[in-house]
Structure formats: structure tokens, C-alpha cells
A protein has these predicted regions:
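Internal hydrophobic alpha-helix adjacent to the cofactor/substrate pocket in enzyme cavities
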Residues: 427-443
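Beta1/beta-strand and adjacent pyrophosphate-binding region of the FAD-binding site
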Residues: 38-52
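Flavin (primarily FAD) binding-site architecture
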Residues: 211-226
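Conserved beta-strand-loop-beta-strand element in the redox core of flavoprotein oxidoreductases
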Residues: 184-203
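Short hydrophobic core segments
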Residues: 49, 204-215
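Mobile, glycine/GP-rich and aromatic-enriched active-site lid/loop segments adjacent to catalytic centers
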Residues: 2-18, 126-153, 157-161, 169, ...
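Core beta-strand elements of the Rossmann-like FAD/NAD(P) dinucleotide-binding domain
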Residues: 42-44, 199-208
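Conserved N-terminal/central alpha/beta ligand/cofactor-binding core
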Residues: 2-27, 35, 67-68, 74-182
Length: 483
């Protein structure tokens, strides 16, 4: 185990636990799969593969722009890790001055969620440096560096339902219980994808495909270049399965944490000794439900089925051990019970696209709007200005017919620490969806979309962008930006 502390480049403190020993897999050779005819399920303008935060935003945005959209999702819900993964703590949507910069589709979600499905500071306190308010909200994952931020926790079931209703309202063809397999390639461009379901293998043909799988499954299988290096001293490469305990009194727990630091430290030390893998409880949207977003496990690959299975098993065992320890030692947890382990494993990193451009650590201090800015993300600390997200980070270096959005966009490993978060996935998803629709309408490849038109359409959909000088006319290929 190693402990990660908060610095100017990370938000949450936490422990990282190393993997168990991996058993070698026997090499048993290969079988030949004969060729076959595959039924065409649907033709469409835009196929979005993956219904997580970025894919949901992409589908809704493309449909709002007038495209015929199909959204393919392997689970029975939308929202991905923000719902099925129980990542219900939504990272900062305001900058360090309290300005809301994660807007557009994300803002629509929070405008439409019921008030009892969201917990967080009121707008009047966003950006506050009042010590009492910062202390209050820091225990509720909504204040960092002594500044109150809009970092709410949400009811995952309500977000599932709302996400589903929004895409249906927009006319998106929603396809659940379907797992994308291989991209369809025509003349060097992506022209759709095959997928598996209870009906067997079928195909969807599309003019533009948006890879919102989170792991770059489609662009990797289509031959696009990608990176998979990690930052060992951060949590961005770890995996775990989150869970919820109910029957708790989180106010008693927060009083214990806030007023008895020695007791809390002793509690955590005892938990590590008793459980091995150990995690502190986080607030949720309700006082009687506790969220556990760890323990974070290092050294596993999100692209290895044996590793994914091992993380699930370790996490489920950790949940049982935590329940016993918390019941005996944690104020407010005497009557706790298991209510849910996440249906989706918490993957933070697998692949990152090598794009025309990238979100780069070297630009953090610049504070200027890039010519092809499609979104703005809050910086990691008050030492840095807001960070510009370029359209080129969604566009593969060479591959046509496809855009990427979500945690696998083009960025370096430092920037991935925040670009993988839920709000940033909403930003890049909305940008990819609008760009895909504009590409179809103009009859051009996504890399040739007119940036002025793209930015105007994003502004019309409520996205926060900044004035910039000399917008590029398109995102053209250049030297690799993401090593």
C-alpha cells in the first residue's frame, strides 16, 4: 500500500493498494471463426457507442443538432460510471472563482434533476473562502484548497432515468443490452460497427461513429494510435468496484471526522490492519446512505478479463469486511447494511487516443482559449487558470469517420487525472456529438468540420466557451501530440 496525498495536481487523498499475484494464463492456441453474413440492424447518421456520461451527452447533442442518432449501450441504463459505477460524487463544475464552467448538457441535467436527488452547496457559496463554510463542505467533498466548489453528489437512479428520457425526447434510437464488437471499415474510414446481443451479431452503418466506450475499444480496433502509459503516483490508473451502505447516520460520522481527528486517524489505522484493503466513507445525496469509492487497486489492466474479475472479487470481499469493521467501530454505522455494489466496475484508465491535438500539462499555466476550444475545464488548483479543451483532442491523427469522447480522448497522463472525470466527459461528449452532426450535414470528415460553425453550435447548446482570436477552419493532422 502507498498513500497518495493532496498536492496542487490532485484533489482527493487516498491509499493505493497493490494487486495480488497474477496466475499465468495457459496458451491453448486459436480457433478459426468462419466468415458469415451479418444482418444490418440500422442505418443512421451518427452511431454513438457507449452510453456513459460522454456517450449520453454525445447522442443528445447530435440529435439536438438534427442528426439521426443510434446510441448503443451494453448495460440496461445510461450514465455509465456516474450511475451504474456509483461514482455519484460529481467532481468540480465551477472554477476556483466560483464560476460555473461545466455547462451545456451537464447544466441541463442538474436543472432537471429533482431537488431531493442532489446534495451540494448552494450557488451563493460557490467560490467562498469563508473558513467555516469551507470546513463544512470539505467534509462533504465540495471544498478544496479552502474554497467551496460545486461538486455535488447525486441519486444514481434519478440520473439514469433523466438521461434516458432526455435522449428519447431528442429522438435518439436507444439500444440496450448490446455490446459493440468491431468497427466497419470502408476505404480507410469507420463506417459503423458490429455488435452482439441476445439476437446474435448484427451491424449498424453510420456516416460518423463516436467512440464513447471509455477504453477506446472502437478506435483501437480500427487501427488508430493510442497511448496507455500511467502516472504511478496518482489514482488515475487504479480500479475498484464502489458500493453503498444504508441505515447509517452520516451526520454522526461527519461530526466524528471533523471534531475527533485523532480518533479518526486511529479508526483508519485499525481498518487497514483489520481489512487490508480499506477506504473511508464518503457522503452521498442522503444522510442515511454512505458511499465507498474504493479501495483503489493498482497494477490491474482494464483490458484483461482476468484482472477485471480479480478486482471485482477483491472489492466484493472488501465490502463485506468493511461492513463488519464499520458496524463495530464507526459512529453512525452501528445499523449499517449493504444496499448495492456497483453493477459497473470503476475503471479510470485504459487507452488514450493519439489525436490531432491533446490536453497537455505544458499548457496548464497558459490560461488562453485555444483556437479550436470546445470546452473549458476547471484547473486542478487555484495556482492554475482554467484549461482549454481543443477539438483536436477528439480527432484521431489519421483515422477518418470517427470521433472520441470521454476519458480516452487525447491527453497526457497528467491531464488525464481530471479529463477522465464525469463533468469533463459531459463536455467532450457534447462537443463530439455536435461535431459529428455537423460533419454529416456538411458531407465532410469530422477533422474537416468548420470550427467557427462548431463553436457557434456549442454556444447555442449552452456550452461555456471563451472569446479567442483566429479560429482554425478545421482540425487537420499534425505531428503526434500525445506520447
Amino acid at each position: 500500500m502507498k498513500s497518495i496525498t493532496r498536492t496542487d495536481e490532485r484533489i482527493l487523498q487516498g491509499d493505493i493498494f497493490e494487486r495480488d499475484a497474477k496466475q499465468p494464463r495457459p496458451q491453448l492456441g486459436h480457433l478459426h471463426e468462419p466468415g458469415r453474413d451479418i444482418p444490418i440492424y440500422r442505418d443512421c447518421d451518427v452511431l454513438v457507442v457507449g452510453g456513459g456520461p460522454s456517450g449520453t451527452a454525445a447522442a443528445a447533442a447530435a440529435a439536438r443538432q438534427g442528426a439521426d442518432v443510434v446510441l448503443l449501450e451494453r448495460y440496461n441504463h445510461l450514465g455509465g460510471l456516474s450511475t451504474g459505477g456509483l461514482v455519484i460524487w460529481i467532481d468540480r463544475m465551477t472554477d476556483w472563482q466560483g464560476q460555473l464552467v461545466i455547462r451545456g448538457f451537464a447544466e441541463e441535467l442538474f436543472d432537471r434533476l429533482p431537488s431531493d436527488a442532489v446534495a451540494g452547496p448552494p450557488p451563493a457559496e460557490w467560490g467562498s473562502q469563508d473558513p467555516a463554510r469551507a470546513q463544512h463542505w470539505s467534509l462533504r467533498t465540495a471544498a478544496y484548497h479552502g474554497i467551496v466548489t460545486w461538486s455535488p453528489t447525486i441519486d444514481p437512479e434519478r440520473l439514469k432515468l433523466l438521461s434516458q428520457e432526455i435522449v428519447i425526447e431528442r429522438g435518439v434510437k436507444l439500444v440496450y443490452h448490446s455490446w459493440a464488437c468491431l468497427p466497419l471499415l470502408e476505404g480507410g474510414r469507420v463506417a459503423g460497427a458490429t455488435f452482439e446481443s441476445k439476437e446474435g451479431r448484427m451491424a449498424i452503418r453510420a456516416k460518423v461513429v463516436v467512440d464513447a466506450t471509455g477504453d477506446g475499444d472502437l478506435f483501437a480496433r480500427a487501427g488508430a494510435a493510442f497511448a496507455n502509459d500511467i502516472e504511478e503516483n496518482d489514482v488515475h490508473h487504479c480500479m475498484n468496484t464502489a458500493w453503498l451502505f444504508a441505515g447509517v447516520d452520516m451526520q454522526r460520522w461527519l461530526d466524528f471526522r471533523g471534531h475527533n481527528p485523532d480518533g479518526f486517524n486511529a479508526f483508519m489505522a485499525g481498518g487497514r490492519e483489520a481489512c487490508g484493503l480499506f477506504e473511508r466513507a464518503f457522503v452521498s445525496w442522503r444522510n442515511d446512505i454512505a458511499l465507498f469509492m474504493g479501495p483503489r487497486q493498482s497494477g490491474y489492466s482494464a483490458l484483461d478479463v482476468d484482472d477485471l474479475t480479480a478486482v471485482e472479487v477483491r472489492s466484493h470481499r472488501a465490502m463485506a469486511a468493511h461492513l463488519d469493521y464499520y458496524r463495530r467501530h464507526a459512529p453512525g454505522f452501528e445499523n449499517a447494511y449493504m444496499v448495492l455494489s456497483a453493477p459497473q466496475i470503476g475503471v479510470r484508465h485504459a487507452r488514450r487516443l493519439k489525436g490531432v491535438d491533446a490536453v497537455l500539462r505544458s499548457r496548464w499555466s497558459e490560461g488562453t482559449a485555444l483556437p479550436d476550444e470546445v470546452g473549458v475545464t476547471p484547473a486542478v488548483s487555484p495556482k492554475f487558470p482554467n484549461i482549454s479543451i481543443p477539438y483536436g483532442a477528439l480527432v484521431p491523427e489519421q483515422l477518418d469517420g470517427l470521433l472520441a469522447c470521454g476519458r480516452h480522448i487525447s491527453c497526457d497522463r497528467n491531464s488525464h487525472g481530471f479529463m477522465r472525470e464525469i463533468p469533463q466527459c459531459w463536455i467532450t461528449g457534447q462537443a463530439a456529438g455536435v461535431a459529428a452532426a455537423l460533419a454529416v450535414k456538411a458531407g465532410v470528415q469530422p477533422r474537416l468540420v468548420n470550427i467557427d460553425h462548431l463553436q457557434a453550435a456549442l454556444l447555442d447548446q449552452g456550452v461555456y466557451l471563451r472569446p479567442r482570436a483566429g479560429a482554425a477552419t478545421s482540425a487537420t493532422a499534425k505531428e503526434p501530440a500525445c506520447a
